[in-house]
């Protein structure tokens, strides 16, 4: 393999690596957006659960024990 062939091979590999890096970056950006969205949904669900839990806590405190 002469020098020119080696340079062409390296340039080819570099182009392939650039494409791969760009594809990986695109996937990473997409996953980050999905992660942020899931975090927002989780925060909303936790808030809703806490609100619902506080509603049930007041109901249970007012109810007499089951043995009465």
From Swiss-Prot:
Gene3D superfamilies: 1.20.5.300. InterPro entries: SlyX. It comes from the Bacteria. Belongs to the SlyX family. This is Protein SlyX homolog.
């Amino acid at each position: 393999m002469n020098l020119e062939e080696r340079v062409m091979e390296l340039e080819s590999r570099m182009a392939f690596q650039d494409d791969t890096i760009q594809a990986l970056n695109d996937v990473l950006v997409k996953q980050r957006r999905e992660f942020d969205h899931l975090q927002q949904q989780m925060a909303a669900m936790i808030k809703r659960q806490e609100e619902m839990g506080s509603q049930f806590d007041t109901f249970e405190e007012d109810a007499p024990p089951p043995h009465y």
